[in-house]
Regions:
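A detector of single, family-specific signature residues
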Residues: 1-271
């Protein structure tokens, strides 16, 4: 994108072409399987001269890359956090499996606080009741009381969980990493919201479209004027069904093409 930004700053008409298009266009020009830098340059130049409907890349599109970078960065961070949460579930199953039936979900602040301070059934069983009850009450903002702390401790005393210091240390470190990711994701989302407020897109007026999903859709699609029908947007996202027909043979079990942006597919599925 450095070269792209440089060309735009110089006011030069700049075009961005889908590599899939150039590859198919190159194959249509010759039956030979020749691919060199010289051939690629000739193919791109030929496409630019023959495609009268090709639109130049605008400065607005370039700055849209900032939003794309943020939404993709957030996507990767959330995916990383999800893997860590899976690790939490695995470690709890080893150290104190009974707690899963005592709370709505493991992945809440009060449970993380408890497991970070007492990373295992043995530690909870040996904890002083006053300290334990104060911790769960503060971490849950009053939702959990002394009775809850007693329930946790009694369950820990008869737990089948293993006493493994190495796993307890891993659990503490994993919780710490999740907290760090939570803070990073929140910071990224704040930056996304700032850009979305500046754009003021009507996409947010659609029921069910949040800042996060709306931002991802806008970032991946860019300029909606490039698409004159919903079908083209679906094709761009790789959500169109693949089609095979030859003579009287017509495939009846079409699969999604899954070409294009996987981030856009995710956003459209989850919007």
């Amino acid at each position: 994108y450095n070269l792209l930004g440089f060309l735009l700053d110089k006011g030069l008409p700049t075009y961005v072409i889908n590599p899939l298009h150039t590859n198919l266009y190159r194959k249509s020009l010759s039956l030979r399987q020749t691919k060199t830098d010289k051939v690629d340059a000739h193919t791109i130049a030929s496409m630019l001269m023959s495609d009268v409907n090709l639109k130049s890349y605008s400065d607005t599109s370039y700055h849209n890359e900032e939003l794309k970078s943020l939404t993709r960065y957030r996507f990767d961070k959330v995916k990383e956090r999800a893997k860590l949460k899976t690790s939490i579930s695995r470690l709890v199953c080893i150290l104190f499996p009974e707690i899963e039936k005592l709370v709505p979900t493991l992945h809440q602040n009060s449970v993380y606080e408890l497991l970070y301070e007492f990373p295992g059934a043995k530690q909870i069983a040996n904890a002083h009741l006053t300290r334990l009850s104060n911790l769960v009450e503060t971490a849950s903002r009053g939702h959990y009381t002394k009775d809850t702390a007693i329930t946790f401790r009694e369950a820990a005393k008869v737990s089948v969980g293993s006493n493994m210091p190495a796993k307890s240390l891993e659990l503490k470190h994993t919780i710490k990493l999740i907290r760090e990711l939570d803070a990073e994701i929140e910071e990224i989302e704040n930056e996304i919201k700032i850009i979305m407020d500046e754009i003021n897109s009507p996409i947010l007026s659609i029921p069910g479209i949040s800042y996060r999903m709306g931002a991802m859709i806008l970032a991946e699609i860019g300029d909606f004027s490039q698409f004159d029908s919903p079908d083209k947007i679906l094709a761009y996202a790789g959500m169109s069904p693949s089609t095979y027909q030859s003579g009287q043979l017509d495939n009846c079990h079409s699969r999604m093409e899954k070409r294009g942006s996987r981030y856009l597919r995710y956003a459209l599925f989850n919007a």
